[in-house]
Amino acid sequence: MSKIKRILKITFIVIFAVLMLLLTVYINHQIRLNAEAGLRLPLGQMVEVDGHNMSVYVEGTGEATLVFMSGGGTCSPILDFKSLYSLLSDKYQIAVVEKFGYGFSDVVDRDRDLDSILKDTRTALAAAGLNAPYVLCPHSMSGLEALYWAQKYPDEVSAIIGLDMAVPEYYDTMNINIPLMRAAGWAAHIGITRLIPGISDSDAIQYGTLSENEKEIYRAVFFSRTATVTMMNEMGRVMENAEKVDSMGVPQLPMLLFL
């Protein structure tokens, strides 16, 4: 056998082995997803927004409604914020809106400019029976949506409580590697993420007050809502969204920022 033929044979064997490994990982992932379906039952109410379902969780009563807004890529906003809002729901009405592609909401492949994101959030809150004005509690990237909300609809926002929220200037020097993020999305879709020990054990699981059952729910949601196409579209627009917010100036309302 010639040297070239040996190289081609070895290359074919390696490629075939990799493909079989990926197929095995994918099949295992699908089996696990089916087994975890019972854990992915919505914790809040599902409301229709533009023909798709969005998840809205409401807890507590009070004159003020605190709307918790998750950071980019947070797989389960309802559980991620639970350790905090459970301390406040005896005095305030709590609302957690899970954007498309997050938590129990549908994954949709659509543009994620600020106007679209904000329209979805406002529609979901209204469909859940919650009325403005709101106190917005954004984390990380949702800071852009909160600021834009206050700029565009000032009568709907009474205050902003930033939970380490992002501001437009944060993205001035940020280098977002979209191809790498899409590769991560592909790995999550195939199920490669299941091979990484402890990858689903977020701060909410390690340091929060979630019950053991809630931790299992979080992990199940993680493996179905990591680097979704909706999240990828959102990250692809974040620079433009930051520029839009920056061009409109600082909204004039009470703000308390925790860093």
Regions found by a protein language model. Give the residues of each.
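Alpha/beta-hydrolase fold catalytic core
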Residues: 2-66, 90-92
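Conserved HGGG/HGGXW glycine-rich cap/lid loop of the alpha/beta-hydrolase fold
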Residues: 52-104
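Active-site loop/oxyanion-hole signature of alpha/beta-hydrolase fold enzymes
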Residues: 96-137
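Residue in the alpha/beta-hydrolase core beta-strand immediately N-terminal to the catalytic nucleophile
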Residues: 134-135, 158-161
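Gly/Ala-rich beta-loop-alpha elbow adjacent to hydrolase catalytic centers
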Residues: 138-142, 146
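Active-site signature of alpha/beta-hydrolase-fold catalytic machinery across serine-
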Residues: 148-152
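Flexible "cap/lid" loop of the alpha/beta hydrolase fold
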Residues: 161-190
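Conserved serine/cysteine hydrolase catalytic core
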Residues: 210-259
